[in-house]
Amino acid sequence: MADFVASIDQGTTSTRAMIFNHRGEEVGRHQLEHQQLLPRAGWVEHNPVEIWERTWSVLATSLNVTGLSAGDLAAVGVTNQRETTLVWNRHTGRPYCNAIVWQDTRTDKIAAALDRDGRGDIIRRKAGLPPATYFSGGKLQWILENVEGVRRDAENGDALFGTPDSWVIWNLTGGVRSGVHVTDVTNASRTMLMNLETLDWDDELLSFFSIPRQMLPPIKASSPVEPFGFTTQLGPLGGEVPIAGDLGDQQAAMVGQVCLNPGEAKNTYGTGNFLLLNTGEELVHSSNGLLTTVCYQFGDNKPVYALEGSIAVTGSAVQWLRDQLGIISGASQSEDLARQVEDNGGVYFVPAFSGLFAPYWRSDARGAIVGLSRFNTNAHLARATLEAICYQSREVVEAMEADSGVRMEVLKVDGGITANKLCMQIQADTLGVDVVKPVVAETTALGAAYAAGLAVGFWKDADDLRRNWQEDERWSSSITDEKRAEGFAGWKKAVQRTLDGVDV
């Protein structure tokens, strides 16, 4: 009997496979990092072949370490870094170029041009997104214009576009032999190419980027009536298992946090931070710099929408302290170092490495460390880095409250940085509300498992999922309103220093 569901979480810095039981408890996992390719200033790439090799390895290893086989799995769910753009040949299976990662800013001039001639307003209305380097449409246009042979092959139906979910599912289902080219509504809603009302590729939006429709995958529900496809005997699982769930990573975290009612919200702390608010079946367009996006679609039901505040650089700022500055040797050391000081010593770090996302959407911004004096140490910079994560989240919370008219009383959190207890305390202090972490912090992988399990009847309904959610830790504010306001004012001043950092 199949008593487990597997989940593939293809993230920005690593790929992991996790296996869950009926209670939503992790019974096994394996995780591998992949290389971050930085060929030029502002460019961020991944090797698609390396991503697929990592996916194969973590899936196979997760089964081996748990002593399970394909027959023990009821379904597989996939979740992924959104917006990251891949193009490959359907006959050879080879990518035409490296994947252009969501953080990449090479398309800044494409994005700026969309706003100058009025196309940006149409994109906002139809796709719910502002023209920005973040989203897939401009990245795909760049590949079509700059990589030899792609446009010709795309027009002939030989070149396939996809976000990482499409690439992983295509390979899992047989690749050049029998690969299924598909995506779900949540990933498609991050491209600037899908109409939020029709849930289909929009011809007018495609024309803005000169994208041939035939290279795009069909769009399906996140938890479809029929599986996307099946793994193969020759694949990493060694047998046929239905692939029955597909969600962009932040939408998967919403499902994993069981934020299934309008008004429920979560904040995921990963490479970036992503705060989503469930708005139900209502399409809510933001007046405060947030995105309108598909939250999920289960079966034949209507889609559920969300408002999202996307922050480009949070966890990757800690990674920068490790990899570029060398002041820590591991991410966990950021907490120990930051605890050596009581405050930031007047230092603010605005990590606008990819410009500023919500609520500013300023691709001209660049990172800055301000307020330095000879008094300051590495510990102050580590503290300022953790504060930057939390101040950026506060800006998004304020925008969300303004759009929804609802005061946030509790913030559900998940993701790797929630292991940093000091960072979570700073978050409670900067917001002035309780911050709550569930027992299963890896809610992205859990959400993909839930979507797949619901599709095949492994879990009956949303109530089954709610029964699985349990609180693990809670942080409450420990500072005065006056001190909270003073710190935030310093942050806002620092942000202004980052603007107009480059010409676009």
Curated annotation (Swiss-Prot):
<protein>
    <recommendedName>
        <fullName>Glycerol kinase</fullName>
        <ecNumber>2.7.1.30</ecNumber>
    </recommendedName>
</protein>
<feature type="binding site">
    <location>
        <position position="271"/>
    </location>
    <ligand>
        <name>ATP</name>
    </ligand>
</feature>
<feature type="binding site">
    <location>
        <position position="13"/>
    </location>
    <ligand>
        <name>ATP</name>
    </ligand>
</feature>
<dbReference type="GO" id="GO:0006072">
    <property type="term" value="P:glycerol-3-phosphate metabolic process"/>
</dbReference>
<feature type="binding site">
    <location>
        <position position="16"/>
    </location>
    <ligand>
        <name>ADP</name>
    </ligand>
</feature>
<dbReference type="Pfam" id="PF02782">
    <property type="entry name" value="FGGY_C"/>
</dbReference>
<feature type="binding site">
    <location>
        <position position="249"/>
    </location>
    <ligand>
        <name>glycerol</name>
    </ligand>
</feature>
<comment type="similarity">
    <text>Belongs to the FGGY kinase family.</text>
</comment>
<feature type="binding site">
    <location>
        <position position="12"/>
    </location>
    <ligand>
        <name>sn-glycerol 3-phosphate</name>
    </ligand>
</feature>
<dbReference type="InterPro" id="IPR000577">
    <property type="entry name" value="Carb_kinase_FGGY"/>
</dbReference>
<dbReference type="InterPro" id="IPR018484">
    <property type="entry name" value="FGGY_N"/>
</dbReference>
<feature type="binding site">
    <location>
        <position position="82"/>
    </location>
    <ligand>
        <name>glycerol</name>
    </ligand>
</feature>
<dbReference type="Pfam" id="PF00370">
    <property type="entry name" value="FGGY_N"/>
</dbReference>
<feature type="binding site">
    <location>
        <position position="315"/>
    </location>
    <ligand>
        <name>ATP</name>
    </ligand>
</feature>
<dbReference type="InterPro" id="IPR018483">
    <property type="entry name" value="Carb_kinase_FGGY_CS"/>
</dbReference>
<keyword id="KW-0067">ATP-binding</keyword>
<feature type="binding site">
    <location>
        <position position="83"/>
    </location>
    <ligand>
        <name>sn-glycerol 3-phosphate</name>
    </ligand>
</feature>
<feature type="binding site">
    <location>
        <position position="82"/>
    </location>
    <ligand>
        <name>sn-glycerol 3-phosphate</name>
    </ligand>
</feature>
<feature type="binding site">
    <location>
        <position position="12"/>
    </location>
    <ligand>
        <name>ATP</name>
    </ligand>
</feature>
<dbReference type="InterPro" id="IPR005999">
    <property type="entry name" value="Glycerol_kin"/>
</dbReference>
<feature type="binding site">
    <location>
        <position position="249"/>
    </location>
    <ligand>
        <name>sn-glycerol 3-phosphate</name>
    </ligand>
</feature>
<feature type="binding site">
    <location>
        <position position="271"/>
    </location>
    <ligand>
        <name>ADP</name>
    </ligand>
</feature>
<comment type="pathway">
    <text>Polyol metabolism; glycerol degradation via glycerol kinase pathway; sn-glycerol 3-phosphate from glycerol: step 1/1.</text>
</comment>
<dbReference type="GO" id="GO:0005524">
    <property type="term" value="F:ATP binding"/>
</dbReference>
<feature type="binding site">
    <location>
        <position position="14"/>
    </location>
    <ligand>
        <name>ATP</name>
    </ligand>
</feature>
<keyword id="KW-0808">Transferase</keyword>
<keyword id="KW-0547">Nucleotide-binding</keyword>
<feature type="binding site">
    <location>
        <position position="250"/>
    </location>
    <ligand>
        <name>glycerol</name>
    </ligand>
</feature>
<feature type="binding site">
    <location>
        <position position="134"/>
    </location>
    <ligand>
        <name>glycerol</name>
    </ligand>
</feature>
<feature type="binding site">
    <location>
        <position position="319"/>
    </location>
    <ligand>
        <name>ATP</name>
    </ligand>
</feature>
<feature type="binding site">
    <location>
        <position position="83"/>
    </location>
    <ligand>
        <name>glycerol</name>
    </ligand>
</feature>
<feature type="binding site">
    <location>
        <position position="420"/>
    </location>
    <ligand>
        <name>ADP</name>
    </ligand>
</feature>
<feature type="binding site">
    <location>
        <position position="12"/>
    </location>
    <ligand>
        <name>ADP</name>
    </ligand>
</feature>
<dbReference type="InterPro" id="IPR018485">
    <property type="entry name" value="FGGY_C"/>
</dbReference>
<feature type="binding site">
    <location>
        <position position="416"/>
    </location>
    <ligand>
        <name>ATP</name>
    </ligand>
</feature>
<keyword id="KW-0418">Kinase</keyword>
<dbReference type="GO" id="GO:0019563">
    <property type="term" value="P:glycerol catabolic process"/>
</dbReference>
<dbReference type="GO" id="GO:0006071">
    <property type="term" value="P:glycerol metabolic process"/>
</dbReference>
<feature type="binding site">
    <location>
        <position position="416"/>
    </location>
    <ligand>
        <name>ADP</name>
    </ligand>
</feature>
<dbReference type="GO" id="GO:0004370">
    <property type="term" value="F:glycerol kinase activity"/>
</dbReference>
<dbReference type="InterPro" id="IPR043129">
    <property type="entry name" value="ATPase_NBD"/>
</dbReference>
<dbReference type="GO" id="GO:0005829">
    <property type="term" value="C:cytosol"/>
</dbReference>
